[in-house]
Amino acid sequence: TMVRDGLVFKDEDGQVIFNQYSFCELVKHLLVELVGISYEEASQIVERSSLATPVADAMEVAIFSHELPYYCAMLLYYGNGYWQKGIPAQPEDMDAHEALEKKIMEKYDLKEPFIWT
């Protein structure tokens, strides 16, 4: 199944739009930028992962939304406990990292992954 944007989930607090395609693409491009692998390899890694599986409800979306795309990318490539292998647990320069995410999203016309309404 192809992941797509515009998935709407409702719960008692309101609704969330999960742009799953954009989220997956952002993680792929972070793998390319931060790890230095090809887009093809990054795509295979992401598409085999839980990031690309169908999401059932708002609760699952909420769980995803607590993970930084950086964290998802590093976890997928380096595995659990990647921070024990000398990989920073989170971006060392958060401003630079946010600028990188923004640049990727603009360049590839990606949507904000999570929109709570």
Residue locations for each model-derived region?
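C-terminal alpha-helical interaction appendages
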Residues: T1-T117
